Amino acid sequence: MKFFAAKLEEGVKGGNGKPSVGPVYRNLLSEKGFPPMDSDITTAWDVFSKSVEKFPYNKVLGWRRIVDEKVGPYMWKTYKEAYGEVLQIGSAIRALGAEPGCRVGIYGVNCPQWIIAMEMTHEDVYLSFLPLAHILDRMNEEYFFRKGASVGYYHGDLNVLRDDIQELKPTYLAGVPRVFERIHEGIQKALQELNPRRRFIFNALYQHKLSWLNRGYSHSKASPMADFIAFRKIRDKLGGRIRLLVSGGAPLSCEIEEFLRVTCCCFVVQGYGLTETLGGTALGFPDEMCMLGTVGIPAVYNEIRLEEVAEMGYDPLGEIQAGEICIRGTCLFSGYYKNPELTQEVMKNGWFHTGDIGEIHPNRVLKIIDRKKNLIKLSQGEYVALENLENIYGQNSVVQDIWVYGDSFKSMLVAVIVPNPETVNRWAKDLGFTKPFEELCSLSELHDEHIILELKSTAEKNKLRKFEYIKAVTVETKPFDVERDLVTATLKNRRNNLLKYYQSANVPLYRYKSTKCTENCR
């Protein structure tokens, strides 16, 4: 078997109140020790100022003006222009009394003015749409500035992100799984509108290219014919220049990752990291199909091991190594601001305890299962990983948004679902219903029959255990949004807020006959 990471230490069995810990793994490139760091680059300012010297007239920050409710073309600042603004902002902060080394909090949306204030191959272009406080976006921007490359910001509306993509034509796109799920849904919708013959040809080309990818060929060499006939059109929808897609923030399903690898004509990988680990803790390999559904191996300056979570049955020394992911290395944070108690809680003997549950496969590749806090115990004593189930059920075309809920005093799971309007309208047309979408969502034929059967089909396809099946659904017509604080800025469910929201509206989530969310719930 091919190993992708080096094993430095064997696991240790727990005892006397101490949990078992698994083997310690490191990147093969740093098996003999972490490589030396660049002594000239110690801060974000160093990253930026060095690039100003090398690439003063390269485009660095791009944005789109909105005039009379119309979004214009991208406008750009050069490295030299941005440098001048950095000095002005730094001078203004000093004038307010801040001294070198002080902590300065900055609240900002994705725009050139804020990335300048935050100190931030020269031909690459990155589209920034994740919040600047999100480590995935911040890490990518810092890296682009190091290379003298360009960063363009979305114009503020994620629902029409495709318009920014077409205008900017990025070479690199990083996002959370929900973004790539929407790309997948859009492609699937277009496929359904093809005539049967063209759809058959597409599927045949898909399987042909996939077979060569599985034999070890790179995405560019697996089937140039299939790329030319069918898949280049999908690449064009991503701007036509895309070279790399990276998903992070939560697990992306194997099915969607495989689909993107086959059809997008570019490298597609998943990564893993946290703010506390400065972002890139682990990253997959683009042309290794055995890494589908995983986040790859430790980055060069990190070590990873798993720690036992006995009450949940996760054993890092078991046949399948599983447990809480712990990280050690030179890229860890120094501590939480004004919170030494929490710092002490997560940092133990040099290991940062992430709160994430992972598996390490026999080839030493890491897979994320869920967050410890997203694991709940049902009344019969079974633990359920809620976020993992949402990722699985969210693959079904009938689902636009889903929140899976389990009460510890109940033996089954329920869910609130926002159906995909296009899928629902197709279903209604086939059955002869002519009602608007909101009225269709109140039909028992939809929520008590069609949606439940679709979810059951997805559960069977993914070999879920019976207690992981959704037994009842509440249908909501309005997508979960940031405005109601139901999701984070990266579109992750805020579980406590969702529960409070529906409880305050007196929506009975546990019921065998489900109905549409009441009007006072909006």
Regions found by a protein language model. Name each.
Residues 4-15, 39-64, 84-87, 463, ...:
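A short N-terminal helical cap/helix-turn-helix that marks the beginning
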Residues 36, 57-118:
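Conserved AMP-binding/adenylate-forming core of the ANL superfamily
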Residues 121, 133-152, 166-167, 171:
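Conserved short alpha-helical elements in the N-terminal third of ANL/AMP-binding
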Residues 312-378, 518:
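Conserved ATP-binding/catalytic segment of the ANL
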Residues 331-333, 346-347, 365-394, 403, ...:
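Adenylate-forming
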Residues 376, 401-403, 450-522:
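Conserved C-terminal "lid"/linker of ANL adenylate-forming enzymes
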